[in-house]
C-alpha cells in the first residue's frame, strides 16, 4: 500500500532475521515488492540473537551465520539473469531453477549488527550496513572505519551505504512517549 501512494520512499524491512526464512521464498516475495514499488526496495537482514525465536522456528542457533551467508548468496543468484546457479546449503532446490519474478533493479542488501564480525561481514557481502540505535556516535564511527578498512584491504569496489537506526516516539510529554513505547522497545 505504501508503494502505491508514494513515489520516492525507500521500502523494506530494516532487519529481517535471515536464518528464519526460506531464502527462495524471500527472493520471490522481495522481488515482488521491488516490482510494485518501481525499484525502491532495500532488504535488511541480520543473524538474530534471540534463542527463543530460533527454537520456535526449529532452526539451530549455531547455524545462524552460515544461514545468513547462504541467504545472501541465494538472493543474489535468484535475482540474477537466468537460473539460480547456486546450490543453497539449507534449502532443497536445484541450481538450474529460474526464480521469478526478478526485481525491477539490483536490490541493495543491507546487513545489521553491532558486533565487529557482523560489520566486517556486511563490508564483504552486502551493499549497506545498518547501525543499531544502541551504538554511540563514536561507536558508529569506529564501525564505519572498520568497513572502510575491510573494503580497502580486500579491494572491494562499489558503493556502500550506511544507515543509522534511530527510534522516534510521539506523546504529549517525554514521559508519556516513553511510557507508551517502553515495553515494545525492550522486547
Locations of the language-model features?
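Active-site-adjacent structural elements that line small-molecule/cofactor binding pockets in enzymes
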Residues: 1-187
